[in-house]
Amino acid sequence: PATKAGLRVYANDLNPHCARYLRENAAANRVKNLVKCYNLDARAFVRALLAPGPGPTVEEPDVPAEPESGGSEKSAGKRERKPAPKPPVRWAAMTPEEDEGAPPAGAVFDHVTMNLPASAIEFLDVFKGAFDRATWGDRKLPTIHCYTFKRADETKDDVIKRGEGHLGARMASPRVREVRDVAPNKIMLCLSFTLDPEVAFGEDDGEKRATDGGESKRPRTER
């Protein structure tokens, strides 16, 4: 669905057969140029994407064109206001062989979908302190969508607390959405939250919030 909207996707699966079929499905649906597929451990995959990059990030800003020599001042002014073609970026330059190796360092993205409900929540710790401030700057940090299960006797707040335990920090305005019943007394949920800068960049305030007692107020969760 993301690629149908023209979004670029970094995808990963530890199972090599799943990764192969992921590539084949992307090609069959004619979105291969928008999907980069990897066969790595989930933590290694995320850390590789978040490592400081050697150059510009995947998204390049428009660069004003330089006026050409000669011609009138009026025509030169028009050329100055016209954006120059974007230079090639790492995404476009990646080959299928590079898909097989390490993901590009210095990538930026808006959403993370962790769609293995049996264990995804256990990997939330990988995001804490993993972001490079020079790469992200003032850019909005990504929203995490983590699928998980809950028992019938658990509340949504219980799921949030479990997620915060694995993240190692409090979540800002977490939202919990019921997906479907999978068995008697077992419900699949999606826990969504946007990373705080203190957590993403590993600043001291994030540590304080993680070890804060139960007196602090939790934002109201979405029911």
Regions found by a protein language model. Name each.
Residues P1-V9, D125:
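Conserved SAM-binding loop of SAM-dependent methyltransferases across substrates and taxa
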Residues T3, L49-L50, F131:
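Hydrophobic residues in alpha-helical segments
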Residues R8, L34, T143:
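Residues at the starts of beta-strands that form the adenosine-phosphate
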Residues N12, Y38-L40, M114-P117, Y147:
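Generic beta-strand/beta-sheet core signal
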Residues N12-A107:
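S-adenosyl-L-methionine
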Residues E66-D110, P117-R223:
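C-terminal catalytic and target-recognition region of SAM-dependent MTase-like enzymes
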